[in-house]
Amino acid sequence: MTNIRKTHPLLKIINNSLVDLPAPSSLSSWWNFGSLLGVCLGVQILTGLFLAMHYTSDTATAFNSVTHICRDVNYGWLLRYLHANGASMFFICLYLHVGRGLYYGSYTYSETWNIGILLLFAVMATAFMGYVLPWGQMSFWGATVITNLLSAIPYIGTELVQWIWGGFSVDKATLTRFFAFHFLLPFIVAALVMVHLLFLHETGSNNPTGIPSDPDMIPFHPYYTIKDILGFLIMLTALSALVLFSPDLLGDPDNYIPANPLNTPPHIKPEWYFLFAYAILRSIPNKLGGVLALVLSILILAIIPILHMSKQRSMMFRPLSQCLFWLLVAVLLTLTWIGGQPVEHPYIIIGQTASVLYFLILLVLMPLTSITENHLLKW
């Protein structure tokens, strides 16, 4: 008799995705981050659901409702900090996942890659709106500064900002709609994840060598299920350590001050995972130019497949490209550091240099290096 997992209409889909899926035998730990992101999304949706049961999206009570969750709700503090630090783990895994795709040439699967970019934007939007909900000082001023960037759009900018705010400033209407969208978007993300996986399973996974691995495949279960479970344990241990020992390590102390439109914090900055983009935004003196650079810093990923000039897919056997890749990582870390610093000398010039380098590496140096490597190998 045929196994039910191979015949049942629903179980068959799960079986073909998680059990009998043929996977390359050479996948390294860099291929763990997809499943880790799935776990992060699950944790965020669950903790977020329980938090939403106690949260009120009203300017008068939002801050107090978060305090109430931490003080009066059973394990409310745990839910709140798991959700806040879970977002940080989400972005760590997300950036490592994108980095893996860049390094090993996974972007040549264009549909999977483009859905991934959409997912990145959706997760960033969700995180931004979530940061506004506790209604602390940094929530309020972060929302004001970031939404105000849309006013740089010619002709419709000002009207667009007021339309998003639901008034003439960030207020009750803004908080209510941000809560609604923050609740809705993770489910849209979950749906996009399904599409992401659908396109991935059309082509099969890439592998570290970048060479087709059709003759050498192994079943996903038990080999990669056990490998993924080890990844889950490591990530959940790290998340637990962060939540239980230093839950406010990655947060901003200003967010423990209730939102006050009459008092601006000395340094307005987003959460750490947006600092690199924030640094690029601030490095351009022109408002519209800064906004364009901010959007392009992520959207540039969409043209990476077009800029792929190498005859090899992966960077595994391309030492010159590897050097450039790690330089790009260093530039991104520098931008993250600069984003959290005040706008003064020498941080301004460091930020501008790093911003120019970021675009230069991706748009010019990487394609040129790929062409050089082709010539070195007489291709």
Swiss-Prot record:
Lineage: Eukaryota, Metazoa, Chordata, Craniata, Vertebrata
Requisite cofactors: heme b
Protein name: Cytochrome b
Keyword ATP-binding: no
Annotated function: Component of the ubiquinol-cytochrome c reductase complex (complex III or cytochrome b-c1 complex) that is part of the mitochondrial respiratory chain. The b-c1 complex mediates electron transfer from ubiquinol to cytochrome c. Contributes to the generation of a proton gradient across the mitochondrial membrane that is then used for ATP synthesis.
Further information: Heme 1 (or BL or b562) is low-potential and absorbs at about 562 nm, and heme 2 (or BH or b566) is high-potential and absorbs at about 566 nm.
TM region positions: 33-53, 77-98, 113-133, 178-198, 226-246, 288-308, 320-340, 347-367
Membrane topology category: Multi-pass membrane protein
Record key words, sorted: Electron transport, Heme, Iron, Membrane, Metal-binding, Mitochondrion, Mitochondrion inner membrane, Respiratory chain, Transmembrane, Transmembrane helix, Transport, Ubiquinone
Residue sites binding heme b b562 per the record: 83, 182
Binding residues for a ubiquinone: 201
